């Protein structure tokens, strides 16, 4: 068996065209979605990622700005900048690029974002709504994973899904989204004993721990769907996933590559959530 490759680049491209059409329809009514990103410091990876978001937003007709603050910026000044964006009626969505410098509390900053502009879906109010099945902003990587599965017409009902990783960014929210689709979900983590026992029985595997080569061909049953969220750079700067891609694709039914799988969908869902935020505050269905 040769796995179906879930090409996140192409799926994201198609999805963004639909978003572009919706942005144009909004503009015809006099509204243009605006995404504001706060970046504190000069971390190279963060700068690259923020620039990718800005470019992607502008490509579909949105306005995007990067509020770049110095590495030494105090927590109070970051919160003041956030307050300004919360109150700015031209801003549809806000996200704060993490990690933040040590002097700035990530939790305090994320809790200070207006929940109606929280396009990353990390505000406690939005996380809470997700867990009681209310409409809310969903974290972008889990949402992107679900769109990949949906695009590939993968039926999740009654399937055994294993999620490796329990972070609030990916592992826990994607587990909740899989539950909403009536999958039976098991979460594995660093204290799990005999991880392979769970993997071998899984119909769906989502790995999001940043450990290259964690999942091998021997761990995966034939026909399983394998989603790789890992993106760890090796000594040459090449991104490696958690899955041994070349060997696992020989047995999997479908698999995401790294890079080019989940990553493009994450940025696309930032745009999706920004569009939703603009529609919600304008009372547009």
Curated annotation (Swiss-Prot):
Gene3D superfamilies: Leucine Dehydrogenase, chain A, domain 1, NAD(P)-binding Rossmann-like Domain
Amino-acid biosynthesis listed as a keyword: yes
Pathway linked to the protein: One-carbon metabolism; tetrahydrofolate interconversion
Amino acids binding NADP(+): 165-167, 190
Catalytic activity of the protein: (6R)-5,10-methylene-5,6,7,8-tetrahydrofolate + NADP(+) = (6R)-5,10-methenyltetrahydrofolate + NADPH; (6R)-5,10-methenyltetrahydrofolate + H2O = (6R)-10-formyltetrahydrofolate + H(+)
SUPFAM superfamilies: Aminoacid dehydrogenase-like, N-terminal domain, NAD(P)-binding Rossmann-fold domains
Alphabetized InterPro entries for the sequence: Aminoacid_DH-like_N_sf (IPR046346), NAD(P)-bd_dom_sf (IPR036291), THF_DH/CycHdrlase (IPR000672), THF_DH/CycHdrlase_cat_dom (IPR020630), THF_DH/CycHdrlase_CS (IPR020867), THF_DH/CycHdrlase_NAD-bd_dom (IPR020631)
GO terms under cellular component: cytosol
Keywords: Amino-acid biosynthesis, Histidine biosynthesis, Hydrolase, Methionine biosynthesis, Multifunctional enzyme, NADP, One-carbon metabolism, Oxidoreductase, Purine biosynthesis
GO-annotated molecular function: methenyltetrahydrofolate cyclohydrolase activity; methylenetetrahydrofolate dehydrogenase (NADP+) activity
EC number: 1.5.1.5, 3.5.4.9
UniProt-listed GO biological process terms: L-histidine biosynthetic process; methionine biosynthetic process; purine nucleotide biosynthetic process; tetrahydrofolate interconversion
Complexes and interactors: Homodimer.
Function: Catalyzes the oxidation of 5,10-methylenetetrahydrofolate to 5,10-methenyltetrahydrofolate and then the hydrolysis of 5,10-methenyltetrahydrofolate to 10-formyltetrahydrofolate.
Family statement drawn from the similarity comment of this UniProt entry: Belongs to the tetrahydrofolate dehydrogenase/cyclohydrolase family.
HAMAP family: THF_DHG_CYH (MF_01576)
PANTHER family attached to this UniProt entry: C-1-TETRAHYDROFOLATE SYNTHASE, CYTOPLASMIC, C-1-TETRAHYDROFOLATE SYNTHASE, CYTOPLASMIC-RELATED
Protein name: Bifunctional protein FolD
């Amino acid at each position: 068996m040769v796995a179906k490759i879930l090409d996140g680049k192409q799926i994201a491209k198609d999805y963004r065209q639909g978003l572009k059409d919706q942005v144009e329809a909004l503009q015809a009514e006099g509204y243009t979605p605006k995404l504001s990103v706060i970046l504190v410091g000069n971390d190279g990876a963060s700068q690259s990622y923020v620039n990718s978001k800005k470019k992607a937003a502008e490509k579909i007709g949105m306005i995007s700005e990067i509020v770049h603050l110095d590495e030494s910026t105090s927590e109070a000044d970051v919160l003041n900048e956030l307050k300004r964006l919360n109150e700015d009626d031209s801003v549809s969505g806000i996200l704060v690029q993490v990690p933040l410098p040590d002097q700035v509390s990530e939790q305090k900053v994320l809790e200070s974002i207006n929940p109606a502009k929280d396009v990353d879906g990390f505000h406690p109010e939005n996380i809470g709504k997700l867990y009681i099945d209310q409409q809310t902003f969903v974290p972008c990587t889990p949402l992107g994973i679900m769109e990949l599965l949906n695009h590939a017409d993968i039926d999740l009902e009654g399937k055994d899904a294993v999620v490796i990783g329990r972070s609030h960014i990916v592992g826990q929210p994607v587990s909740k989204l899989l539950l909403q689709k009536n999958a039976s979900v098991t979460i594995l983590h660093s204290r799990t004993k005999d991880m392979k026992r769970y993997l071998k029985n899984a119909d769906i595997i989502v790995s999001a721990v940043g450990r290259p080569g964690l999942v091998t061909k021997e761990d995966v049953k034939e026909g399983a769907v394998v989603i790789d969220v890992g993106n760890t750079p090796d000594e040459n700067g090449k991104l490696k996933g958690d899955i041994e891609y070349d060997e696992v694709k020989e047995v999997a039914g479908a698999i995401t590559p790294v890079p080019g799988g989940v990553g493009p969908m994450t940025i696309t869902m930032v745009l999706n959530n920004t569009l939703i935020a603009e529609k919600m505050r304008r009372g547009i269905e």
